[in-house]
């Protein structure tokens, strides 16, 4: 089977889920200048064609720096924010205006020689952002640097209903006609919150949030963000993106994502695959450990059948699983059962058997087996069981490392010993609870 067929089948639930959803996408000025910008535009057009309501927010920092240098002006910052005097504001307006027009032109192109050839869409920009001055902080006058006061929710939603892509620039206007230089991260975050967006997507140079060991952090909850901000420091752009992502979630946005503008296809990978390719920040749990329900039988069969074929697990038919479903605990991720374990109380004894412990091969890098083991042990104690047995042919060392000790058929309660399969010759371990 062609690989794209399998990919499309796996992506189809996400295509349906994203249709008619509102996504706010923030692309910094560095991302617009990057060679991958053309691919990002193609991907945005694809999202639009799939029914996603798109608000695109662009930055302009490097473009402003170029204009300041051309005029012999020195950029001035305080606490990471640009101080925008009158001369700097002229550079800001020039940079933002040119960039907005360039982005509109790119989105207006016929996507010749691309999957989106023939796509026609409308891009709309305007005075959707009302701003106010930051003013004087710690004795420093920020002049024309401002912050978002409100976003024209009704006006933007009306355009989204009409199938326009709304383009927001990092400029805001006051009711008295003043112009303020804004941070694109602030514009995107406030737009996502005020619009009640389903997602805020933030582009950065890296794949996402990188931890102290150089590894990608794939998932975070807002409560975990402060520790990373402290590690990164206030001058780190990753910290700015992470702070914006967490603020959006606290403001009611369903999910925030940090992805790379340098990685071709990063946006689509993040949105249409189960594990994504960037960093996800969300209030809800990404994985749920729970007791199994009858609706999980199909997912359990998908999980354990390959292990049964290899002789690692004892075969269980659909009928058996349906009958014994209440014995199972599962780990669910994005609607997919990725791990399971079962607890059987052994008749006429105070012992139980841990059985059918299985983890999807793609998710064995985590501690999901340990999580399920703890879950089963907690259930066993709640049932008043004193001993937990396990029979295994392949994972003896794993259980020994977790406190199980070698046992024998003679140690099994008679109700279980009479069912022991000598041909399978499983090793027996037990653990006092």
Swiss-Prot record:
One Pfam match, by short name? AA_kinase
Q: What is its main location?
A: cytoplasm
User: What keywords were assigned to this record?
Assistant: Acyltransferase, Amino-acid biosynthesis, Arginine biosynthesis, Cytoplasm, Transferase
From the UniProt record, give one GO term of the biological process aspect. Answer: L-arginine biosynthetic process
Q: Does the keyword Iron apply?
A: no
* Top enzyme category: transferase
Question: Where is the N-acetyltransferase domain positioned along the sequence?
Answer: 287-426
Q: Name one GO cellular component term.
A: cytoplasm
Reaction catalysis annotation = L-glutamate + acetyl-CoA = N-acetyl-L-glutamate + CoA + H(+)
As for family, the record states: Belongs to the acetyltransferase family. ArgA subfamily.
Please identify the protein, giving its name as recorded.
Answer: Amino-acid acetyltransferase
UniProt organism field: Pseudomonas fluorescens (strain SBW25)
Q: Name the gene that codes for it.
A: argA
